[in-house]
């Protein structure tokens, strides 16, 4: 299977290309190969071999900012960019019958609706987090949400590196949605609670709040704290290396292939039953 990777200068885009090239060198059956590497418009790295760019061996795939030029070179597109760019890639893939793996976060309700409509024509695996651990955590939280009435407060704490733009994280929103049984709900910022570089978010009509921290080079940490008088239940996930998200995205691309149509998530890919 030939994969296209967008946002090649970003943390995830670069890591995905590195992983594909590394895996290509050791694959016997060539389960996947790099077919295209796509950068933002007018990027000064266009024309450079993707392998050279990620400090690996040359692969004969040259970075481009024009996806039209490489549409015949890939089967599935992996996108971890920005919301507006993702929408452009979704429209392109629908027009050209290409399946997608989307890990872009910070998507609005209207953008999520675009993805849902597109999935009636192409196959899309969309997730705010491609780690196995988070997928299992969400399964556990399905049970916790059923007993949430026994706790006085439920809080979500998420920490990421100081370059991450979206606050709160897409994973934190997903966690809250699982607990609330509300998919793709909005998050409201209470500016009165902003202090010391920490922003606290929460819907105005319930007691579930999201606390977001941006500091240093934290890959990703998410905790759910269920508290009552005298006790606390905490469920926590820590990501120590970005490679867990990369491997989840690649596994999703292989699972999705060219033939599947519909909207899927990592739970569909992993087939976890709890």
From Swiss-Prot:
Name the pathway it acts in. Answer: Amino-acid biosynthesis; L-lysine biosynthesis via DAP pathway; (S)-tetrahydrodipicolinate from L-aspartate: step 4/4
UniProt catalytic activity: (S)-2,3,4,5-tetrahydrodipicolinate + NAD(+) + H2O = (2S,4S)-4-hydroxy-2,3,4,5-tetrahydrodipicolinate + NADH + H(+); (S)-2,3,4,5-tetrahydrodipicolinate + NADP(+) + H2O = (2S,4S)-4-hydroxy-2,3,4,5-tetrahydrodipicolinate + NADPH + H(+)
Q: What is its EC number?
A: 1.17.1.8
Q: Name one GO cellular component term.
A: cytosol
Q: Which InterPro entries match?
A: DapB_C, DapB_N, DapB_N_CS, DHDPR_bac, NAD(P)-bd_dom_sf
List ligand-binding residues for NADP(+). Answer: 40
Q: Where in the cell is it found?
A: Cytoplasm
The annotated active site, in chain numbering, is 160, 164
Q: Does the keyword Oxidoreductase apply?
A: yes
- Signal peptide range: none
In Gene Ontology terms, what is one molecular function of this protein? NAD binding
Q: Which residues bind NAD(+)?
A: 7-12, 103-105, 127-130
Q: Which Pfam families match?
A: DapB_C, DapB_N
Chain sites annotated for binding (S)-2,3,4,5-tetrahydrodipicolinate: 161, 170-171
Q: Report any one BP term from Gene Ontology.
A: lysine biosynthetic process via diaminopimelate
Which protein family is named in the record? Belongs to the DapB family.
Please explain the role this protein plays, according to its UniProt record: Catalyzes the conversion of 4-hydroxy-tetrahydrodipicolinate (HTPA) to tetrahydrodipicolinate.
Q: Describe its partners and assembly state.
A: Homotetramer.
**Name of the protein:** 4-hydroxy-tetrahydrodipicolinate reductase
What organism is the protein native to?
Blochmanniella floridana
Q: Gene that codes for this?
A: dapB
């Amino acid at each position: 299977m030939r994969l296209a990777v967008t946002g090649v200068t970003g943390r995830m885009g670069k890591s995905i290309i590195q992983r594909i090239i590394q895996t290509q060198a050791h694959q016997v059956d060539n389960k996947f190969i790099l077919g295209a590497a796509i950068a933002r418009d007018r990027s000064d790295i266009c024309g450079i071999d993707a392998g050279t760019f990620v400090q690996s061996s040359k692969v004969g795939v040259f970075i481009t900012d024009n996806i039209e030029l490489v549409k015949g070179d890939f089967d599935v597109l992996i996108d971890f960019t920005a919301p507006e760019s993702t929408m452009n890639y979704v429209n392109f893939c629908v027009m050209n019958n290409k399946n997608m793996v989307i890990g872009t976060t910070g998507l609005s309700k209207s953008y999520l609706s675009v993805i849902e409509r597109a999935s009636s024509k192409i196959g899309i695996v969309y997730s705010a987090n491609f780690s196995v651990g988070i997928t299992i955590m969400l399964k556990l939280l399905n049970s916790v949400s059923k007993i949430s009435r026994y706790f006085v407060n439920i809080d979500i704490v998420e920490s990421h590196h100081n370059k991450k733009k979206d606050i709160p994280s897409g994973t934190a929103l997903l966690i809250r949605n699982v607990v609330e049984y509300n998919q793709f709900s909005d998050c409201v910022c209470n500016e009165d609670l902003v202090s010391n570089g920490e922003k606290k978010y929460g819907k105005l009509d319930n007691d579930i709040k999201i606390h977001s921290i941006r500091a240093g080079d934290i890959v990703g940490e998410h905790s759910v704290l269920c508290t009552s008088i005298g006790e606390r239940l905490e469920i926590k996930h820590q990501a120590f290396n970005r490679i867990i998200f990369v491997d989840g995205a690649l596994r999703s691309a292989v699972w999705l292939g060219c033939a599947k149509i519909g909207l899927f998530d990592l739970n569909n890919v992993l087939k976890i039953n709890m």
